[in-house]
């Protein structure tokens, strides 16, 4: 096979022009774009490329056919691990060089055909290269399809688990309703259990509240008194508190005097509380104070 070039005159091949427009379009950089050195192009997403760009520019959506056409126009694959192709006349911004990229074709003469068939066997090597290129394309497509199949199977399995869970809940509800119909006491026991738990919780809260509540100072009938002359001294109450206060100081200082014996100013009135008191009219000093004086530090 021989490669013909059109350095003078002639236009750009439609396939080359369309390929250049796809590569040079910034809107499609996620699918097809220029290489790092701008002397090659990379098909980043062959699946999206075959589904969107190929039908828009060509009459097919076969990525393998696109690769075969690239090989026919002299493009070569640069990186074996990705779809990167290059041509000496396919450069970014150098559109005037595109006319040099022409389709490779065999000569019309018999001599040329014999020469191509004999010699070094260049035609056979080119055909073998085409077959290898197509085999590589098919292998990559198969690998991609297997990967997509695994992803789809994973999504289907997840959906199936959700469906099973959705079906299990109505079955559980139906089983519960059947149980309630067969034994109406089941629902009552559940309600009673909830009420019991709520009451226990309220009781615990009430107990905590009473623990922090301050005790009331009460003097009940269990208090004991002792008589010291004409006074009745409250010594203790059953709950440990004393009249007028609490603690040993209040127990030592508090004295009870009947209301009918002493008025509100503390003066003796002659009531029953001090019936044995002797009043000396000839003494010119006031009678003894009815309440004991306790040394309080003043």
Swiss-Prot record:
Coiled coil: none
Key word Phosphoprotein present: yes
Gene Ontology CC: one annotated term: nucleus
Primary location: nucleus
SMART domains (alphabetical): HSF
Region described as Hydrophobic repeat HR-A/B: spans on this chain: 145-181
Keywords: DNA-binding, Nucleus, Phosphoprotein, Stress response, Transcription, Transcription regulation
Post-translational modification: Exhibits temperature-dependent phosphorylation.
Pfam families referenced in this protein's UniProt entry, alphabetically: HSF_DNA-bind
Motif (Nuclear localization signal): 213-216
PROSITE patterns linked: HSF_DOMAIN
Region of interest: Disordered: 105-128
Any one GO biological process: cellular response to heat
Domain remarks in the Swiss-Prot or TrEMBL record: The hydrophobic-rich region (HR-A/B) corresponds to the oligomerization domain.
Complex formation: Homotrimer.
Annotated function: Transcriptional regulator that specifically binds DNA of heat shock promoter elements (HSE).
Family: Belongs to the HSF family. Class C subfamily.
Protein name according to UniProt: Heat stress transcription factor C-2a
Taxonomic source organism: Oryza sativa subsp. japonica
């Amino acid at each position: 096979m021989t490669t013909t070039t059109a350095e003078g005159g002639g236009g750009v091949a439609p396939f080359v022009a369309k390929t250049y427009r796809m590569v040079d379009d910034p809107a499609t950089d996620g699918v097809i774009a220029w290489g790092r050195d701008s002397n090659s192009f990379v098909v980043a997403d062959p699946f999206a490329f075959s589904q969107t760009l190929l039908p828009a520019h060509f009459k097919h959506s076969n990525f393998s056919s696109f690769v075969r056409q690239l090989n026919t126009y002299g493009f070569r694959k640069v990186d074996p691990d990705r779809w990167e192709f290059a041509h000496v006349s396919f450069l970014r911004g150098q559109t005037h060089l595109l006319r040099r990229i022409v389709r490779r074709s065999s000569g019309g003469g018999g001599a040329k055909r014999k020469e191509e068939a004999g010699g070094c066997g260049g035609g056979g090597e080119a055909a073998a290269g085409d077959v290898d290129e197509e085999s590589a394309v098919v292998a990559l497509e198969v690998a991609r399809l297997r990967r997509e199949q695994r992803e789809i199977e994973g999504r289907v399995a997840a959906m199936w688990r959700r469906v099973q869970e959705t079906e299990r809940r109505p079955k559980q509800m139906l089983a519960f309703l059947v149980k309630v119909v067969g034994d109406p006491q089941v629902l009552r026991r559940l309600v009673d259990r909830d009420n019991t738990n709520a009451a226990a919780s309220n009781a615990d809260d009430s107990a905590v509240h009473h623990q922090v509540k301050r005790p009331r100072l009460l003097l009940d009938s269990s208090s004991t008194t002792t008589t010291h002359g004409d006074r009745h001294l409250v010594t203790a109450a059953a709950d440990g508190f004393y009249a007028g206060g609490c603690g040993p100081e209040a127990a030592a200082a508090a004295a009870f005097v009947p209301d009918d014996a002493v008025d509100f100013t503390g003066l003796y009135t002659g009531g029953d509380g001090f019936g044995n008191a002797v009043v000396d009219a000839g003494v010119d000093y006031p009678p003894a104070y009815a309440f004991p004086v306790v040394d309080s530090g003043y």
